[in-house]
Amino acid sequence: LFFQELMDKFQILNLGVSVYNPKEIEILQASEIELSFQFPYNIVDTRFENIQIKGGNRFARSIFLQGLLISSKSIIKSNPKLSSFQKKYHNLLSELKLDGLRVAISKVSYSNKIDYFLVGVEKLEQLIELVNLNLYDMSKLNLLDDVSESDIEIIDPRLWN
């Protein structure tokens, strides 16, 4: 009721919530208000793919997984499990002659489970690069079908040390 009054009073068209796990969406959708959701989604974290969202928009965030999926240079050595995963992932990309940035953007761009995606950039040049990026076709992405990861210590940056 509070949110509906707020939306009516201030002519708010959309109300969104940032969530970390699929269960939160299930709980929040019990409300009467149509909500948009922002959640982590990328080539290795696909936990939200099968969640039905009623009405609101679906925003993917963490599509680069804090940079881990697009750069092999920033390997986190203090976390052996994460470091091992990152090395394996980038070795696979190298073997397949795929670019991590193009893979990340292609994954969310082709997904029918995502309406929008969010990215962070440090410089205008990075944004221009993203806008002008050539996407891989689905056959290239299908080569990575087995990289999905369920280990929460890898896919949730809040748990990295």
Model-derived features with residue positions:
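Beta/alpha (TIM)-barrel catalytic core signal, keyed to glycine-rich beta->alpha loops juxtaposed to Asp/Glu
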Residues: 1-160
